């Protein structure tokens, strides 16, 4: 699902929201989540999962073109850990064929 599909589904589910307002709501939520992670905070959405940061220590890498050793600096990368309810829901549906065309009404 893309961001535009999420906006369209939100607008369809809540008819009082025009597409522009649904787009603003999704962008605002994603901006708030991005800002929280950028500031080193953890995000927890009960039943869905949590977003956090994992530290990747510095290491010596190799330039694939020249074979030269290069120092790859330490960095933090976003990490998602699914919650129990989400894992169970996905597991129940794992045996069913994927339906990319139909939106999930349970969201």
From Swiss-Prot:
GO terms for biological process: DNA recombination; regulation of DNA-templated transcription; regulation of translation. Residues 82-101 have a biased composition (Basic and acidic residues). One of its GO terms (cellular component) is chromosome. Heterodimer of an alpha and a beta chain. SMART domains: BHL (SM00411). The gene is ihfB. CDD domains: IHF_B. Belongs to the bacterial histone-like protein family. This protein is one of the two subunits of integration host factor, a specific DNA-binding protein that functions in genetic recombination as well as in transcriptional and translational control. Residues 82-107 are annotated as: Disordered. HAMAP family: IHF_beta. GO terms for molecular function: DNA binding; structural constituent of chromatin. This is Integration host factor subunit beta. Signal peptide: none annotated. Keywords: DNA recombination, DNA-binding, Transcription, Transcription regulation, Translation regulation. InterPro entries: Hist_DNA-bd, IHF-like_DNA-bd_dom_sf, IHF_beta.
